Amino acid sequence: MSKERVKVQGYVLLDVDVVALNNAGKDTMSNFDNAVKTKSIYKNGNNYVYVSGQAWRFWWREALQKNIGWTLSPVIRDKNIAFTNADPLTYPDDDIFGYMRAATEEYEEKGKKKSRNITVTRVSPLKNSVLVSVASVRPVSNWSSMARQDGDSVPYARQEYSAIMKGMFSLDVDMVGTFSDYNRSGYKNISETLREKAINEGASEIADPFGTGKLVRLPLAIRQKRIADTLLALKNISGGAMQTNNMGDVTPKFIVLASMNTGNHPFSHISTSRGDRDEQAILNINGLREVLDEYKENFIGKVFIGRRSGFFDNYDKELKELAEKYNDLIEYLPINAAIDKYTEQLKSQI
């Protein structure tokens, strides 16, 4: 009996103070010539600060390089475009984060060397949202000055904020280490040369469950390691703008990790806000309970919930009661322990 197709569904909450994690350029509303605003967006008349999905992915990629030891695919610049090496066999980040590259491939025909243009595309198995404040936030504009030189000081301003921020991600386990080489736009993940190299190095061919062709799949141990590394990197992820003077901790302070047999992400509303201006972030325990009940047929294995002591301590009792009620479905642990135990469960599901 074949295993179910597994999608990792993750939900995180960050807790940051006096930061400016992702800026949006010059603040045209400021009285200062040198003023920078932070990224924010309006919903229902309220302002919410956010970090772009691209920035979060950049931090994630760097964590995999610096803390896990991945060798990242080199970035190649050609006039007004940039692309990675597009070699998911050698570089695990090309596999996990995807790529698109227009390339030329040499081949022999009747003893003569010829070249042909190919474009390889890899849709990322790892999808993620932006990181956005759970509650409405009004950034504060603070000014500083460069005053070490002779003469007048040079003032500049920046926006800062404190917020609880939420983010979602999804990792398609079956896609990791699995590549198609169909000669169709968007479906050619690897060149014929890389396909042959993969087979020679131990990759296998498997039937495409959604097509009539064959897919190339890397050995299980390689796929397991890439998937585990991607999740374990969350324990030490770091990044953000203005870190010299406004350093912030962007590791999760609350996390939910679940294996599911669908691509739907059900945890999007387990945190919400209240107050006259929606200024207070809260954990929606009823919403979490509702998700556990309504999607119980879609979960594969246990759902792991992690919380850092000192963050949302007032929900500890309710979360423990929830774990007792759903003891066959939930494990409630500290953050890193939850990530570690979920990763071990996931290895057996691949």
Walk through the language-model features, giving the residues of each.
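RNA-binding basic/glycine-rich loop and surface signature characteristic of RAMP-family CRISPR effectors
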Residues: 1-350
